[in-house]
């Protein structure tokens, strides 16, 4: 099965720095099956994220790339995934990041 990876960033991302390197272990990432991410992608298209760096603000997940999820967007993302029972681990990760005011990194396909 194809997976997406989500992890909590220990430090806030820095301007002009790219986060293209695939390093899920660095962020103690969890794996989420693409079948479940596919279900929520359309509902995230109005949520503000960053793709690959802080220099590229965008809406929606970088489905095949790297998404930087700011604390300000985490609550909305939790609302979107709440109805999908299979995303409970992701919901817990997002709640933890939100409570600690941390960024989340997403590695797409």
Residue ranges and their predicted role:
Residues 1-103, 107-109:
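Acidic (Asp/Glu-rich) sequence patches and key acidic residues
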């Amino acid at each position: 099965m194809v997976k997406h990876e989500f992890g909590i960033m220990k430090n806030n991302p820095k301007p002009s720095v790219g986060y293209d390197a695939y390093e899920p272990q660095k962020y103690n990432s969890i794996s989420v099956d693409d079948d479940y991410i596919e279900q929520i992608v359309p509902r995230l298209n109005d949520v503000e994220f960053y793709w690959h760096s802080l220099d590229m603000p965008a809406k929606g997940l970088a489905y095949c790339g790297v998404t930087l999820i700011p604390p300000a967007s985490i609550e909305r993302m939790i609302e979107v995934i709440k109805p999908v029972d299979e995303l409970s681990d992701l919901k817990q990760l997002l709640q933890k990041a939100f409570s600690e005011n941390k960024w989340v990194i997403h590695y797409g396909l």
